[in-house]
Amino acid sequence: MTDQIRTLQGRVVSDKMEKSMVVAIERVVKHPIYGKFIRRTTKLHVHDENNECGIGDVVEIRECRPLSKTKSWTLVRVVEKAIL
């Protein structure tokens, strides 16, 4: 049996913490009654060892063991840097 490590892509919404950031993961779900597609957002705390990300960057993250009370994801790579 193989365990696949979950990886997601999202946008950095906060990088004010030391070695940490908040990433917003956006998904589209269908409303159960009306059938309209709605955007839903989940915010995750992510470990950024080298402080290489800034607000607006698109990043790839993967799940890991719990690093703190709220942080159990780590940065894999920066997919796209934000244009400021």
UniProtKB/Swiss-Prot annotation:
Subunit structure, briefly?
Part of the 30S ribosomal subunit.
Q: Does the keyword tRNA-binding apply?
A: no
What is its biological role?
A: One of the primary rRNA binding proteins, it binds specifically to the 5'-end of 16S ribosomal RNA.
| SUPFAM superfamilies registered for this protein in UniProt | Nucleic acid-binding proteins
GO aspect biological process, one term: translation
Q: What protein is this chain from?
A: Small ribosomal subunit protein uS17
Task: List keywords of the entry alphabetically.
Answer: Ribonucleoprotein, Ribosomal protein, RNA-binding, rRNA-binding
**Keyword presence, Ion transport:** no
Q: Which PROSITE patterns would you find in this protein's record?
A: RIBOSOMAL_S17
A cellular component term, taken from the record's GO annotations = cytosolic small ribosomal subunit
Can you name one GO molecular function term for this protein?
structural constituent of ribosome
InterPro entries, alphabetically?
A: NA-bd_OB-fold, Ribosomal_uS17, Ribosomal_uS17_bact/chlr, Ribosomal_uS17_CS
Which NCBIfam families does the entry link to? Answer: PRK05610.1 (NF004123), uS17_bact (TIGR03635)
Which family does the UniProt entry place this protein in? Belongs to the universal ribosomal protein uS17 family.
